Structures are given as C-alpha cells and as structure tokens.
Amino acid sequence: MLTPTQQVGLILQYLKTRILDIYTPEQRAGIEKSEDWRQFSRRMDTHFPKLMNELDSVYGNNEALLPMLEMLLAQAWQSYSQRNSSLKDIDIARENNPDWILSNKQVGGVCYVDLFAGDLKGLKDKIPYFQELGLTYLHLMPLFKCPEGKSDGGYAVSSYRDVNPALGTIGDLREVIAALHEAGISAVVDFIFNHTSNEHEWAQRCAAGDPLFDNFYYIFPDRRMPDQYDRTLREIFPDQHPGGFSQLEDGRWVWTTFNSFQWDLNYSNPWVFRAMAGEMLFLANLGVDILRMDAVAFIWKQMGTSCENLPQAHALIRAFNAVMRIAAPAVFFKSEAIVHPDQVVQYIGQDECQIGYNPLQMALLWNTLATREVNLLHQALTYRHNLPEHTAWVNYVRSHDDIGWTFADEDAAYLGISGYDHRQFLNRFFVNRFDGSFARGVPFQYNPSTGDCRVSGTAAALVGLAQDDPHAVDRIKLLYSIALSTGGLPLIYLGDEVGTLNDDDWSQDSNKSDDSRWAHRPRYNEALYAQRNDPSTAAGQIYQGLRHMIAVRQSNPRFDGGRLVTFNTNNKHIIGYIRNNALLAFGNFSEYPQTVTAHTLQAMPFKAHDLIGGKTVSLNQDLTLQPYQVMWLEIA
C-alpha cells in the first residue's frame, strides 16, 4: 500500500511525463536539459504536493480532478516557458527574498487609471510624479473590458485578456508595466475571480447551454434553490437587489452576490478553477507583481451557510497560490476580505495571500478621530496586528470602497462599548448627522432591516477640509503617519496626498447615482497637484507632510518588517507603539495638547531624536504633543 506522499509523487511524475508527451523526442531531450525545465521541475517538486492536497480537499470525489490537473500543469509549463527572461530573474530574486514586500522602502499608491490619468499612455506620463512621491508599488484600477454603463466601477469583467478600449490595449498595459519596473515600481492589478460580468464569453455560453461551459455559473430554473440559499446569505448591496440572486429575461435565476450584472462563478466545477488559473497566468506574464484577490470570502457556496469564509475558499486560494509558485513565483497575492477580524487574518499566509488589506486598522483610525479615544485602536494593535513570518498588512486610510465598521463586537464589549450602538454613532458622525461633526461623508447602502450602513467620502472630506477646519490638514497627516509606521506596506489612495474633496456631481450621472462610492472617486484635480509645493495651501501642507514622512520611512531601517509592540501612554487620546525595539511612535488624536508623563516614559532613554520634527526631545520629563501631532522617536 502506497503512502499518500508516495501517491502524490507518482501522480507528479506521471504529470511531468504528460506535459512533455506533446513534443518530439528531440524536442523533449532539449527541454529536459534546459534551465527553464530545471526551474519548473524544481518548483513542481516543491509545490505540487500542496496544489494536489488543496484541490483534493475540494474536488477529491470528482472524476474530472486528474484530467483537469493534467491540463492545468501543461498550461502552467507553457506559461512559464513563454515568460520573459527579466520576469524569470525576478522570480528567482523573490524566491530568495520573500520579505521584499516588508522593506521600509516599500510605499504604495492606488488610483483609477481613467480618473487619474485618462488612459494608460497618460498614466505612463505620470511615472515621474510617482517617483517624486516615493512610490514603489502602484495598484491600477480597473483595467479590463467591462459592460458600458453600470459595471461596478469596472469590477464586472467581460474579458481578463482585453483592456477597456477607453484605456488602451494590452500592449499599452505591457508597456506601462515595463516602464513602472524600470522606475522601480511594482505593478498591482485586480484579479476579480469570484465573478465575471454577464457579458463575459463564459457567461454568454453558459446561459446558452454550451456544454463546454455547463455549470460555470449558478443558474437555476426557478426560485426553489435560491430561496433556500437566501435564508442564510448576507445582503451585500441591498439597494441594488434583495438577496443573492437576479432573474434573467428567460425567467431563470443566477447567483449575483454583488450586482445583477456580476455573475458568481461556480467553483464546485473544477474546470472553472482551471479556466481562472489560465487568466491568472496570463496576467502574471504581462509583468504584474501583485494580484489583488477580490472578494476572497465569497468564492465557495454551500447550502445552509453564509457562503462566506468557508474552508474550501481558503483551499482554492492556496491552490491558486501553488500554481503561481510553480509558474510565476515573483507574483504575490493581496487579499481583500472585509469581514470579521478573526476571518480577515485567516486569508494571510505565505501559502495563501502574502499580504492583505488591513480593514480593521483603517476603520479604527476613523473611529479614533471621531471619539478622540485610542482604546479600540490600541487594543487592535496589541492583539490583532502581528502576522505570520513573511507576510504583511497593507495599511491604508481610504480606498475606492466604502468604510465599513469592521471591528468585532466582542472586542468592543470588552471595553464596555456596544458594537451596534457605536456603529450607529460612527455612521451619524461621518455623514454630518451628529452635533460637532467635522466630517462630510455620504451614506452608502443603508439597510433598513438591519440598520447597517457604510460611509463614502474622500479622506479630505471626512477630516473637515471642505469647511476649512483648522485641524483638517493635521488629521490627514496623523492618519497617514499610522499607515506609514505600524509595519507592513502603506498604501496611499492617490488624491489624498493633495487633499482632494468629494465629487459632488456623482449623483447627476445615471450610471453612478445609485452608488455613493463615486463621491470619493473624483477626477485628477490639476489645480490641487499644481499647489503641492506651495506651503501656503492645504494641498501643499498635506503633500509636503506626507512626502517628508515617506522619505523618513524609506531612509530608516527602523521601519522594516511588520511587527510592533504597543506602548501604553496612559493618556486616552495618544496612541503609542514601538517598532523593532528602536522607534517609539506617538500620535495625538485630540484637538487639544496632550501629555505623556515622565513617569510613563521612565524606562525610555533620557533623550530621543524626533524623526518628523527633526529635534531632540527629553524623555525624563513630561512630553507634550500638540493637537494631532505625530512623533517618531529614535530610542535605539
């Protein structure tokens, strides 16, 4: 009787043979001696057992598993053999240095290509600006062909191999990525793998009954099955449609977690996995460095569950990861999981998503601004921040999406806070329905049956810049100081660095009027960017402040890595934490001066250099921070 390890080894050898069977004996002999085959075979030896185990856990009883694997690995070999030499060099470099993403040099930016630059050629022209800001990572949103009109901001993909014609061509994208690499900037794109648009060829052929695409999506003849699923599903966009299904013109029902034009893929069909792996490898060979794995929580469906965060979803992502380790190991995954904090962290791991959005820290930064109290933020940094080795948070202040209050009710309850009541307060505060609020946000997806609501708005609008609040500029700098210094990869939603306000015209566009997130998706404001070096303007003060902090971070190895230790300031308005036993960070979330007492600082050295202020401060006496002031103190 063979052991499981021996069985996997035999399958691996069989599949290697099958990959080469399509070649003539002479071709095969040459391939087997090639460096490409040596590297590919080595990576198969290392990562195929993981791939096999993950797929077996999902599809073990499906007779299509082995033939699917055979086609998948043949596809992976073709992809690797066609990968250009510079990308293969990056593959090896990142295999040898998996912590490249944790360097203090890393600073990210994210933008809509059309809104920021018009098209891909316009974006290429802005590379000198990205270098000026200090970016080493650029997330380009959204790039691919999508339906005209409503498309969830481009996240309803009609083809993963065609750029939206308004932006350019695949050739243009390849040129932009090469130019970014030349400038020392990694390219990040979205991998929207939970769903496609209803106009995707697969969707059209599945709906038409093409046997090659049978069961690529969840299509039901009537409401019997959808009604059973809906009993346990969470409504994501209740304004768009109740439940998780939409009716087709012929009366059938299709699974649409998000919008009626976004059809969920059916991963219980192993050929869907193989098809999406092919799209993933195509993107890798364009030169993409990081794939933002969209909507990771939703990819597996199971009756009687919420169909979120199921074990099979994790297994499938790990299987995609294993394919990438074999055929394009330079490419990392970034998780997008806006779920309970316990579940967010489960997607992050060297074998799953090496980096992941940090929605808890983002939400708690805004919470701390509203309450002026650091208790929830301090708790999260203490117990929920540190990640496994070789992984990192993507720390952000704003994004293209709404703000959801994703802290755990049990965490809030431990501090004597009602999670439900506190979320109601935060929603009222940030949409200016609370006395004394400085924010000018917009409600998003209010659900009257649950009371749930999220918030739209740019950082500048949410900190009070629209009404010239005297503390608005310092609030933005404070928030970004946390993102830049807590450990991991900081991400700037481009426009924030010059204080871009909401687009108040979003509701006048019929393709956007039912989605308030367009409020914080304004076009590039040329006038604001022209002011970025003028310290008499808010744009200049924000830009120069952020640029200074970025330069400090990138020049100082104390910001390397991702781990921290919280420091109790004994002041409810001041957050404190230590990085690498060498840097003590403080941030005052109050509009009044606040003090850390000498007694609290007694274990610290007598003096420390403030990297932001450029001054030496005494730590053997009370330390006062001005309203919204940040200090990064060298203590070793």
Curated annotation (Swiss-Prot):
- Which spans of this chain does the record mark as coiled coil? none
Explain what the record says happens when changing H195Q: 98% reduction of activity
Q: What is the lineage of its organism?
A: Bacteria, Pseudomonadati, Pseudomonadota, Betaproteobacteria, Neisseriales
Q: Which family does it belong to?
A: Belongs to the glycosyl hydrolase 13 family.
BP GO terms, sorted? carbohydrate metabolic process
Instruction: Please give one Gene Ontology molecular function term for this protein.
Output: amylosucrase activity
Which Pfam families does the entry mention?
A: Alpha-amylase, Amylosucrase_C-like
User: Reported effect of changing D401E?
Assistant: Almost complete loss of activity
The reply on keyword Iron is no
Could you say which residues bind substrate here? D152, H195, Q262, R292, H400, D401, R517
Which source organism? Neisseria polysaccharea
Name by which UniProt lists this protein: Amylosucrase
